[in-house]
Regions:
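Short Cys/His-rich metal-coordination motifs, predominantly Zn2+-binding knuckles/fingers
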Residues: 181, 251, 348, 419-421, ...
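Catalytic cores of large soluble enzymes that bind and process phosphate-bearing ligands
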Residues: 5, 9, 13, 53-57, ...
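Short glycine/proline-rich turn/loop motifs
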Residues: 41-47, 375-385, 470-477, 558-559, ...
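N-terminal, positively charged nucleic-acid-binding surface of large information/translation enzymes
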Residues: 1-234, 258, 275-288, 292-307, ...
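Short acidic-hydrophobic surface loop/beta-edge motif
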Residues: 200-206, 244-249, 343-347, 416, ...
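Active-site-adjacent bridging/hinge elements
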Residues: 34-42, 64, 101-103, 128-135, ...
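Feature 926 captures the class I aminoacyl-tRNA synthetase adenylation module centered on the KMSKS loop
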Residues: 201, 393-452, 456, 500-543, ...
Length: 878
């Protein structure tokens, strides 16, 4: 057996192993009638992106599940791909062209799209290469792109089919408009942020001034597009003037007073201005009351020709000037400070303007019902379950989805218009002439919302609309792993399309994880400068360390706080594991490792095998229930504490002994526990586990194709394991005395254990272990305290009370002096912390984090003082 290097080199190992894995096709999956399929489709990252910490947690969780299922005997497919990301990519290319002094309108659509494809080919694969650095075991042979030929064919077919069913239509409706990106946005693409503004109260007078109505608005610039004032039909204050008119201040245009139940008569004056072209609720009132629609904003956020003297001003310039003019006219009643949610573009964060525009829409109500039912029935479940409420809330209140975008990069809408008769033709292949009049046709200029194509991702990537063996075998997929921030954008739409197109659920489980935040709990962002580059972390600490820190810190659905200390702890774990494996392999040497002989097991062996069984059962259950953080933490605790700190130390005396049969059995146990531990750890730390596994005797060609561990009934020793835990508890108590009384490790203890019955017998069999790990030269067991010398300290453990004479081990007077000095220092610390916390000025002004730290320091100091005083009391009684 070749000797392992003294230290683990993650950089050399990771590059070497990944190349080998990919070359040997270990990630590849094929339809296999002898195996059950398990499929995950990757949430396709944008081609504009590069690996960030959000990707890292997302892909780590998916990879852990895939590796677990692969080892559990499934034909596990993790299907990768990238998203064309219409707006994000187009913005990038426009920015690049702007540096060259080029406008996209100057070069035309074809030349722009050539640039876009060139950009995609140059930069689009960057994030895929970075995913490999993370250890992602995707089936790269099946990599897809949302605008590749197959996906594009699926998109066109679905559009045409939905159009034929009347579920896609074109019409003038209120939409969300980004004046910066100059495109429509769906409701899900609008982010809301609290902004402090004002509420302007404006009076509208009757033409003859005989009556008036006051309304309040947060957007006075929309007054230019008002077409009515609405009141509630049951509001007696306005019964006499419904149907009459008022004059828009400054503008001078008469508008009617209408009655509509949308108005809350208890709110404000009970009257609202209606601007159907620039507010979604007003648009609905306008439809019910047959009001005209006056759009007064241009696509780039200026006032158009209907704005009269305000034409050409930006919306903000118009607001300022119009308010001044209304005040001058005497119609401004008052201005109040007002905080409200303002819609912003999810991509560029510009303020979104609601306005009426001719767009393409998907009628969502009929599509939403089966998508709701499939979750309610339990066919699709959310993990954690609470996120199904988020899903229901969105789906039950869903509005029609605006799917057209005024962009060039994306799936062009397959609609064609006749230049002569105006006929609209929607078809999968472009018709040459108008079927109605034979006239010339031109295609719709708009492209589809990116989420329209990614909503078909689970089945378009498997070959639909063709009937493929992959689609038949791997669909429906098994698990979707994603963040809670795209439940509306993506999850809901995949369920909608799955039920409508495939008449099947797209997946069985939606596993939701939270966001990765910084150590203060803040969202990571460029503006805060608190972002973390996963590639830098991988370079410094290794992919395994990053992956493990992300999994252990992330409970399902909850946000996690991330910092390099967690990665350092994971790196330390790698080193601990490596050193343990090196010890095991050095002790195995070239010896043959056979099966474990259960007839030769002692109590320590039975304990570790029992614990291994427990770990296998619990970790398997955790993986199946998506409690990946618990699974990772359990294997960490088992390997670090029970295997490395305890069993290896318990094994050393026997490995150094002369009983060859016993040594062979201990070698077999060490090998088996290490091998199964590596397998349990592999989904989270694929590189180091593979590197160590391949050094073990009887290893297969790769750990990822080896079988997931199974518990063995013959290794269940609950009683012996309980006894061993009591022995370990006793050793820990003795070590605490040694540490607290400052007894050097070189000084051997003489111990008397007071216990009786079966425990005495069990402890007697464990005396060699107690002597070795407690640092004792003599251990006696007796039934009572008779004959215990006075100059002893005691430690109470579950199995026994340990009495240790100290007079021969330490200078009692010096130790008493040392403890007194330490106690005085701790008292001083307590006084200082108490003083701060009792100071009202400190508590009022200090940050909560600082106050919490001070309370923590005080509690720790008080605990330490109790321990010191207890030890002093023992010394004083000697």
């Amino acid at each position: 057996m070749k000797e392992m290097p003294k230290a683990y080199d993650h950089q050399g190992v990771e590059e070497k192993l990944y190349e080998k894995w990919e070359k040997n096709g270990y990630f590849h999956a094929e339809p296999n009638p002898d195996k059950e399929p398990y499929t995950i489709v990757i949430p396709p990252p944008n081609i504009t992106g590069q690996l960030h910490i959000g990707h890292a947690i997302d892909e780590t969780l998916q990879d852990a599940l895939i590796r677990y299922k692969r080892m559990s005997g499934y034909e596990a497919l993790w299907l990768p791909g990238t998203d064309h990301a219409s707006i994000a990519t187009e913005v990038k290319i426009i920015e690049q062209m702007a540096k060259e002094g080029i406008d996209k309108r100057d070069i035309g659509r074809e030349a722009f799209l050539k640039r876009a494809w060139d950009w995609k080919n140059e930069y689009g694969g960057r994030i895929v290469k970075q995913l490999r650095k993370l250890g992602a075991s995707c089936d790269w042979d099946r990599e897809r792109f949302t605008m590749d030929e197959g996906c594009s064919k699926a998109v066109t077919k679905v559009f045409v089919e939905l159009y034929k069913k009347g579920l896609i239509y074109r019409g003038d409706r209120i939409i969300n408009w980004c004046p910066h990106c100059k495109t429509a946005l769906s409701d899900a693409e609008v982010e809301y942020e609290e902004q402090q503004s004002h509420l302007w109260h404006v009076r509208y007078d009757a033409p003859d001034k005989s009556y008036s109505i006051t309304v309040a608005t947060t957007r006075p610039e929309t007054i230019l597009g008002d077409t009515a004032i609405a009141v509630h039909p049951d509001d007696e204050r306005y019964t006499g003037i419904v149907g009459k008119t008022v004059v828009i201040p400054v503008v001078g245009r008469e508008i009617p007073i209408v009655a509509d139940e949308y108005v809350e008569k208890e709110f404000g004056t009970g009257a609202v201005k209606i601007t159907p072209a620039h507010d979604p609720n007003d648009f609905e009132v306008g439809v019910r009351c047959n009001l005209p629609v006056m759009r007064v904003f241009t696509d780039d956020g200026h006032i158009n020709e209907l704005g009269g003297r305000y034409e050409g001003l930006t919306t903000m310039e118009c607001r300022k000037k119009l308010v001044e003019d209304i005040e001058a006219a005497g119609n401004l009643v008052k201005i109040e400070p007002y905080g409200h949610n303002v819609g912003t573009c999810y991509r560029c964060h510009s303020t979104v303007e609601p306005l009426v525009s001719k767009q393409w829409f998907v009628s969502m109500k009929p599509l939403a019902k089966p998508a709701i039912d499939v979750v309610r029935s339990g066919e699709i479940r959310f993990v954690p379950e609470r996120f199904d409420k988020t899903y229901y809330n969105w789906m039950e209140n869903i509005r029609d989805w605006c799917i057209s975008r005024q962009l060039w990069w994306g799936h062009r809408i397959p609609a064609y218009y006749c230049d002569d008769c105006g006929e609209t033709i929607v078809a999968e292949t472009a018709p040459e002439r108008c079927p109605k009049c034979g006239g010339k046709l031109h295609q719709d200029e708009d492209v589809l919302d990116t989420w329209f194509s990614s909503g078909m991702w689970p089945f378009s990537t498997l070959g639909w609309p063709e009937k493929t063996k992959e689609l038949d075998y791997f669909y429906p997929t098994s698990t979707l792993v994603t963040g809670y921030d795209i439940i509306f954008f993506w999850v809901a739409r995949m369920i909608v399309f799955g039920m409508e197109v495939m008449h099947q659920k797209p997946f069985s489980t939606v596993y939701i994880h939270g966001l990765v935040r910084d150590e203060q709990g803040r969202k990571m962002s460029k503006s805060l400068g608190n972002g973390v580059d996963p590639l830098e972390i991988i370079k410094q600490y290794g992919a395994d360390s990053l992956r493990f820190s992300l999994v252990t810190g992330n409970g399902a659905g909850g946000d996690m706080r991330f910092g390099t200390k967690k990665v350092e702890a994971a790196r330390n774990f790698c080193n601990k594991l490596y050193n343990a494996a090196r010890f095991v392999l050095m002790n195995i040497g070239d010896a043959e490792v056979g099966d474990i002989d259960i007839s030769r097991l002692d109590i320590a062996d039975k304990w570790i095998l029992n614990r291994l069984n427990t770990m296998i059962r619990e970790i398997t259950a955790n993986m199946d229930s998506f409690d990946l953080n618990l699974a990772a933490q359990k294997i960490y605790d088992f390997v670090w504490t029970e295997f490395c700190d305890w069993y290896i130390e318990l094994a050393k005396p026997r490995m150094n002994g002369t009983d060859e049969e016993q040594k062979a059995n201990v070698r077999a146990i060490l090998n088996r526990v290490l091998m199964d531990s590596l397998k349990l750890l592999h989904p989270f730390m694929p590189f180091i586990t593979e590197e160590l596994y391949l050094n073990l005797p009887n290893a297969e060609e790769t750990i990822m194709r080896s079988a997931w561990p199974k518990a063995k009934a013959e290794w269940d020793y609950p009683e012996e394991a309980e006894t061993m835990e009591e022995v370990m508890d006793l050793i820990r108590a003795t070590r605490n005395i040694r540490a607290e009384m400052n007894v050097p490790p070189s000084r051997k203890l003489k111990m008397t254990l007071v216990t009786h019955g079966a425990r005495a017998k069990a402890l007697e069999a464990s005396i060699p272990y107690i002597m070795k790990l407690a640092g004792a030269e003599h251990v006696a067991i007796q039934q009572d305290k008779h004959g215990i010398p006075e100059n002893t300290v005691s430690a109470v453990a579950q199995a026994a009370e340990a009495f240790i004479p100290l007079s021969d081990l330490i200078d009692v007077d010096k130790e008493r002096e040392r403890l007194n000095k330490e106690a005085e220092k701790v008292k001083s610390d307590i006084a200082r912390s108490s003083g701060k916390l009792n100071n009202q000025g400190f508590v009022a002004k200090a940050p909560e984090k600082v106050i919490a730290e001070e309370r923590k320091k005080l509690a720790a100091a008080e605990d330490m003082l109790k321990k010191l005083e207890a030890r002093l009391e023992q010394l004083n009684n000697m």
